[in-house]
Amino acid sequence: MADSGRPAVEAAMENELRLLDPEVRRCVQELGSLLHPEHIEFGRSGRRRDRAAIIAALTAEDTRAVRPITASRMTAVQLAPDLVHLTFDTDNNGLLAHRSSLWRQTEDGWLLYFHQATPFTAPTVGEGAQDV
């Protein structure tokens, strides 16, 4: 975790991990408290969604029958006093994605302004893990 000692980075990372929590994903109010009013996302599916569409999609998911989403390789950089960029990987029941998030500080705290997910497959044994 890069820059993990900084309060802005810690707040963004903590909030990102909250978004992966099944309880938070089921609650309109909790999701709303973490998403910027102008939030945009390019999801793993390739669809572009705004704040309302993300809240509707996440709260409609049945997360009780599946494993929790796991995050790994999270790194963070504070780009400006009010902007933090996170990158990490997730495993959502075998669906892998590289993720990138921009968190903005507002009067309401650190809110997710932009998010993008890109699907990937885990390299097999003997396959190169380097990307050029």
Residue spans for each PLM region:
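A beta-strand edge to alpha-helix "cap/lid" segment located at domain peripheries
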Residues: 2-33, 40-132
